[in-house]
A protein has these predicted regions:
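Repetitive helical segments and hydrophobic/amphipathic motifs
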Residues: 11-12
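Bacterial Sec-dependent N-terminal signal peptides
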Residues: 2-5, 15-39
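First exposed extracellular module after export/assembly in secreted or surface-exposed proteins
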Residues: 28-159
Length: 159
């Protein structure tokens, strides 16, 4: 499963433009911003001691639109592209009793994506395509909106 996930991510990402692009339509919702970003295979770094707890691959993406106001009143959701669909992070897969996770941290002006396995032998992720959604004001979102469902978020963004 780890190998399948890595291969699927690499194959899918080869067809994607590698630049971070802001989806900025004039009809979009002012409370949401969304970006497509592809982390290239050479943009992954390692942290920790191989074979030990905490060994992981990570990549950092600068996003100036993650402001103090977003940190205090909004939210950031990230979706990973797998097999032409987007799934919310954290993404967890299980193979032969070992668990692979793709997670993220949000900082002022930046997000960090990290990948690790419970067997402490994480394989380099390769290229990974993400959708990053910034909710500027959570209180202004409708109750029916499931922010874990990228299609709902995209539909709401384009209202």
């Amino acid at each position: 499963m780890k190998r399948f996930l890595s291969i699927a991510l690499m194959a899918t990402s080869l067809a994607i433009i590698t630049a971070c692009t802001k989806d900025d339509s004039p009809n979009g919702n002012a409370n949401l911003e969304h970006f497509t970003y592809t982390i290239q295979s050479n943009q992954w770094y390692t942290r920790g001691v191989y074979g030990s707890l905490g060994w992981q691959y990570y990549s950092q993406i600068d996003i100036p639109d993650i402001t103090k106001d977003v940190m205090e009143n909004g939210a950031v959701m990230i979706y990973i592209k797998q097999n032409d669909l987007f799934y919310p992070l954290p993404a967890i897969t299980d193979e032969d009793g070992w668990v692979n996770t793709v997670q993220f941290n949000v900082y002022l002006g930046q997000v960090e994506i990290f990948v690790e396995d419970t067997d402490f032998q994480t394989v380099a992720p390769g290229a990974m395509t993400l959708k990053i959604v910034i909710f500027n004001k959570l209180k202004s979102l409708p109750a029916y909106l499931d922010i874990k469902d990228y299609k709902q978020v995209l539909s709401y963004t384009n209202k």
